[in-house]
């Protein structure tokens, strides 16, 4: 399978990639499962409240059962009392979902294959900046007619990372930092030839 290498002047040459990695049929259910699992794993789940067992206060009965004229009370930590525990207290929860590595890699292959079919995968020889300037990055992207884009490199340089940090429609990742949500979030995905070859090794 051949992918065109883009330059500011237009397509220039091609690069051979594996059909197994970039020519897969799109599996919507698998991609959906991978996206849901990734987003669930990103949830903090750190909510917490104190129930009647966790709030401070003694276990002593506040007053005797009968003869006072007041309502019966067994503890000052009752949810009915001020400063008592919460009736159905929220507890910390792990929202993560298990997804096999084989399925996860297959989902990434499906997304990359669909991007290639839709001509949203832009292959370049290299993509770097001489200085960490956002203006330079915007100008470089404009040469390729790109604005809403994910840039994938074999190793992300600090200059490129710092320049892209101030653009909310641009993100930079290395091959190991890829996830399904980032791949489907942007209009175009720019990948260097070196990163493409490394991706092929990881996915096949």
UniProtKB/Swiss-Prot annotation:
Q: Does the keyword Cell membrane apply?
A: no
Gene3D superfamilies to which the protein is assigned, alphabetical: 3.40.1370.10
Organism domain of life: Bacteria
Checking InterPro entries in the record gives:
Ribosomal_uL4, Ribosomal_uL4-like, Ribosomal_uL4_dom_sf
Molecular-function annotations in GO: rRNA binding; structural constituent of ribosome
Can you quote a single GO CC term? ribosome
The cysteines joined by S-S bonds are none
From its record, what is one biological process in GO terms?
Answer: translation
Q: Which UniProt keywords apply?
A: Ribonucleoprotein, Ribosomal protein, RNA-binding, rRNA-binding
Pfam families per record: Ribosomal_L4 (PF00573)
Residues covered by region (Disordered): 49-72
Family under the similarity heading: Belongs to the universal ribosomal protein uL4 family.
Q: Which PANTHER family match?
A: 50S RIBOSOMAL PROTEIN L4, LARGE RIBOSOMAL SUBUNIT PROTEIN UL4M
- What quaternary structure, including any partners, is listed in this protein's UniProt entry? Part of the 50S ribosomal subunit.
Biological role stated in the UniProt entry: One of the primary rRNA binding proteins, this protein initially binds near the 5'-end of the 23S rRNA. It is important during the early stages of 50S assembly. It makes multiple contacts with different domains of the 23S rRNA in the assembled 50S subunit and ribosome.
Name the UniProt record assigns to this protein: Large ribosomal subunit protein uL4
Species of provenance: Saccharophagus degradans (strain 2-40 / ATCC 43961 / DSM 17024)
Task: Kindly list the organism's lineage.
Answer: Bacteria, Pseudomonadati, Pseudomonadota, Gammaproteobacteria, Cellvibrionales
